[in-house]
């Protein structure tokens, strides 16, 4: 992946075992990069490390399985519209762990 993924470093060159989430860049300027992610059930982002602080706002209710370094996993459910913020440096793979499509908008702070 290239272009808007410039701030995200994929952790492995291995092909993903699951379908890939669809990423649609909405804004990319000097201050922010805004990307919408749409996941079919079971789809994933692939392992990556965030190069910038970011805010996530779910468009739908999101049932996520987060794969983390060292083999740890976390299941989280985030209601539509409930935003959260993370610092740069987060490494993970985000998977739609639900039975329905899920979507969120990511705002990266430059």
Residue ranges, per PLM feature:
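Tryptophan (W) side chains
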Residues: 4-5
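A short glycine-rich, His/Asp/Glu-containing loop-to-beta-strand
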Residues: 19-47, 53-56, 107
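Short beta-strand His + acidic residue motifs that chelate non-heme Fe in jelly-roll/DSBH
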Residues: 45-47, 65-66, 91-98
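Glycine- and acidic-residue-biased ligand/ion/polar-headgroup-sensing regions
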Residues: 50-70
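Short acidic-glycine-tyrosine-enriched beta hairpin
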Residues: 72-88
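Ligand-binding loop in jelly-roll beta-barrel domains
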Residues: 89-110
